[in-house]
């Protein structure tokens, strides 16, 4: 069973080296949560704290990326466990909510958000086409 833990700089370096596209989504600071099995990272999420504008005027953790790989490990609870760990961090940080954006084509991700209790706010283009959703969990 995978270990879920806070990531460190060496984890970030390993993730970027293995999956170069992540260099664009893993920012400095923030919160890196990793799932590792036998000292191999098999999943991660990265979130950052930001201020929500009026009328809420509180802080949230925005989940910029969540990944589980290899593909055969998906839909087995790793992402759920990483989100649970982030929720613990968010509670300790006393943030208002956890939030993320999910592309409409990412059906398995939408299922994850619904399963873990996140509310769904569709995003529509001016022509009415829905392109994705902001999902959030108020703490």
Predicted regions and their residues:
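Conserved acetyl-CoA pyrophosphate-binding loop and the N-cap/start of the following alpha-helix
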Residues: 72-85
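Conserved active-site alpha-helix within GNAT-family acetyltransferase domains
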Residues: 80, 104-122
């Amino acid at each position: 069973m995978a270990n879920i833990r806070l990531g460190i700089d060496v984890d970030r370096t390993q993730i970027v080296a293995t999956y170069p596209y992540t260099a664009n989504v893993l920012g400095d600071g923030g919160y890196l949560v990793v799932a590792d099995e036998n000292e191999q990272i098999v999943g991660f999420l990265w979130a950052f704290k930001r201020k929500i504008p009026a009328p809420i005027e509180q802080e949230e953790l925005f989940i910029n990326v969540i990944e589980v790989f290899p593909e055969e490990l998906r839909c087995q609870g790793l992402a759920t466990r990483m989100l649970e760990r982030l929720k613990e961090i968010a509670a300790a940080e006393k943030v208002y909510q956890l939030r993320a954006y999910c592309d409409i084509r990412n059906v398995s991700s939408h299922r994850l958000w619904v399963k873990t209790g996140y509310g769904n706010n569709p995003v529509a283009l001016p022509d009415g086409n829905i392109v994705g959703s902001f999902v959030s969990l108020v703490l």
